[in-house]
A protein has these predicted regions:
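Membrane-interacting alpha-helical segments
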Residues: 2-9, 13-16, 20
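Active-site and donor-binding regions of nucleotide-sugar-utilizing enzymes
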Residues: 18-121
Length: 121
């Protein structure tokens, strides 16, 4: 029941989230560059990739050795939640791996995300 109420509230707030994203995007263009990621779209199709989520800049820096360990034959997607995290992740890993914003926590967006990417781990 709680999840249903959460999803309904989230759905009602989506216009506010988009407005907030546009305001942030006016200050930091990176927020707008991957706006489709926020709704579960705009990803490059990969072959059973490994998803690593690093919320912020500190976590992006912290996964460096982990990413090196998993590289090789594995396709890796690095997801972030902040513009500074995205910028640093693109700088460190963007030449070899896909770097994206994780979609907003709404079941439709998350389902689109996982269905399209077909994540292995």
């Amino acid at each position: 029941m709680f999840l249903f109420i959460y999803q309904i509230c989230f759905f009602c707030l989506i216009p506010i989230f988009f407005l907030n994203l546009l305001i942030k995007g006016a200050k930091q263009k990176l927020y707008l560059s991957k706006i489709s990621n926020r709704i579960g779209l705009g990803f490059k199709k990969r072959n059973n990739p490994i998803l690593i989520h690093a919320v912020s800049l500190g976590e992006v820096l912290g996964i460096k050795n982990f990413v090196k360990t998993l590289e090789g034959d594995n396709e890796i997607i690095i997801s972030v939640s902040t513009a500074t995290g995205l910028q640093k992740a693109q700088e460190l890993y963007g030449h070899k791996h896909q770097v994206i914003f994780l979609p907003w926590d709404f079941f439709i967006f998350i389902n689109l995300f996982f269905r399209f990417l077909d994540i292995k781990l």
